């Protein structure tokens, strides 16, 4: 998965 810091460390 791509890093999605807006939700959590991994999205």
From Swiss-Prot:
Sorted alphabetically, the keyword list is:
Antibiotic, Antimicrobial, Defensin, Fungicide, Secreted
Q: What domain of life?
A: Eukaryota
Instruction: Explain the purpose of this protein.
Output: Significantly inhibits the growth of Gram-negative and Gram-positive bacteria and fungi in vitro. Has antibacterial activity against S.aureus (MIC=9.6 mg/L), B.subtilis (MIC=76.8 mg/L), M.tetragenus (MIC=38.4 mg/L), E.coli (MIC=76.8 mg/L), V.parahaemolyticus (MIC=19.2 mg/L), and V.anguillarum (MIC=2.1 mg/L).
Which family does the similarity line name?
A: Belongs to the big defensin family.
An example GO BP is:
defense response to Gram-negative bacterium
Its subcellular locations are: Secreted
Name it: Big defensin
Q: Provide one Gene Ontology cellular component.
A: extracellular region
